[in-house]
Amino acid sequence: MTLKPIHVIGGGMAGSEAAWQIASAGVPVILHEMRGVRGTDAHQTDKLAELVCSNSFRSDDHTTNAVGVIHEEMRRANGLIITTAKDHQVPAGSALAVDREGFSEAITAKLEAHPLVTIVREEIAGLPPEDWDSVIVATGPLTSIALAEAVRAHTGETDLAFFDAIAPIVYFESIDMDKAWRQSRYDKAGPSGDTAAYINCPMTEEQYNAFLDALLAAPKTEFRDWEKDTPYFEGCLPIEVMAERGRETLRFGPMKPVGLTNPHNPTVKAHAIVQLRQDNALGTLWNMVGFQTKLKYAAQTDIFRMIPGLEKAEFARLGGIHRNTFLNSPKLLDRQLRMKSMPRLRFAGQVTGVEGYVESAAMGLLAGRFAAAERLGQRLEPPPPTTAMGALISHITGGHLAEKQTFQPMNVNFGLFPDITDYSKTDENGKRLRGKDKGRAKKIAQAIRALQDFDAWLAGEAVVAAE
């Protein structure tokens, strides 16, 4: 029986990986890539999986780093991107960095050589034709205007963003709750009935002024040339831009102190208050409300640790603002990465709201496997949320708690994983682990569990395929 091909739109990290996974499952795939007939503002070549920004895939340590764990999961799943990266590795300490030209040339050659892969150089302007019954849209942060507008028209204007304004995210366990407290402004209950939905960090006038001075003096990351024509919009101004408008601007904006009472010191009115809002269903990650920023990373950690309660903050993600195209995935996509309102379309990569090469490729890997299984008359469930890939797909398709307008791209990190308590909390001498040593032990346990559960998922996938 001749199988009808699956169409993949976009030959970046996610699209290349998706095409490889589909073909590896024995299903024909047509990969549509517009570069070659139409360029982008950022790409330099027409090669597949071209690395636009950094040449680093970040940490390759799968024992204590969530990025390394997703690397290892992708290796075990015959991931094209991660195995090719290893073949073109350049020295970078514990990170996996690649020779970018050799890497993209190798990806292109492997896909061109596969008998089930057809590469078509064309732009898909608008939604795919109706007779394409299985499509993966993996068009990345620089999705063409025509396709982006078609998706936006179908989903609704507020459900597709063209600029991500990322606020820092803090691990809950690193927040000093002896200084901070839980309370919603004016004790107003949210949809869940919770009147203590925010964590509040108070500042005196002296602390606020010192914070403001540091903020104004801090080094900032400049926009790339192809981002400069994307203006700020008022709802997502960088915090340092707000500060430049006047010393009181932040106190009447994201740091306003009204409607809140510090239970640690109830008779003293805070001069300013920084709020953090829960960012995932597990309650392990909290984002700094209104703190989107273009500050350089080192400056962010130094300055944000000036905030009372965040002196020892550990960041799951630092802030940033750059041009991007991404869906409000928790609202629009199901657990198979299909658009709920048009199930023939799957989405993969950065357009789903993941951030980074590795995360994009991982979502391409899953989308490709989901689509191939469906074409073969099977149903493949996502990996469990205890795995790196499972945690990431759970986050973008339902684990993100905040209002739809606040969904922003996310890197993989252990804060997305379910908590784990079954691990040794003592060292080899029986001494109780504390601080960073305890955190390291927990990460090791989470990494071990992730890879065990991922292997079990792969084994289950093989059983489904054999049925």
From Swiss-Prot:
Q: What is its EC number?
A: 2.1.1.74
| Biological processes, Gene Ontology terms | tRNA methylation; tRNA wobble uridine modification
Q: What Pfam family is a match, any one?
A: GIDA
Q: Where in the cell is it found?
A: Cytoplasm
Q: Which InterPro entries match?
A: FAD/NAD-bd_sf, MnmG-rel, MnmG-rel_CS, MnmG_N, TrmFO
Q: Where does FAD bind?
A: G10, G11, G12, M13, A14, G15
- Cofactors (names): FAD
Transcription regulation listed as a keyword: no
**Mind telling me which PROSITE patterns this protein's record contains?**
GIDA_2 (PS01281)
Question: What keywords are assigned to this protein?
Answer: Cytoplasm, FAD, Flavoprotein, Methyltransferase, NAD, NADP, Transferase, tRNA processing
> By its UniProt entry, which PANTHER family does this protein fall under?
GLUCOSE INHIBITED DIVISION PROTEIN A (PTHR11806), METHYLENETETRAHYDROFOLATE--TRNA-(URACIL-5-)-METHYLTRANSFERASE TRMFO (PTHR11806:SF2)
Q: Which HAMAP family match?
A: TrmFO
**Similarity annotation:** Belongs to the MnmG family. TrmFO subfamily.
The protein's job, in short, is: Catalyzes the folate-dependent formation of 5-methyl-uridine at position 54 (M-5-U54) in all tRNAs.
Q: Tell me what this protein is called.
A: Methylenetetrahydrofolate--tRNA-(uracil-5-)-methyltransferase TrmFO
Which species expresses this protein natively?
Hyphomonas neptunium (strain ATCC 15444)
Q: Which gene produces this protein? A: trmFO
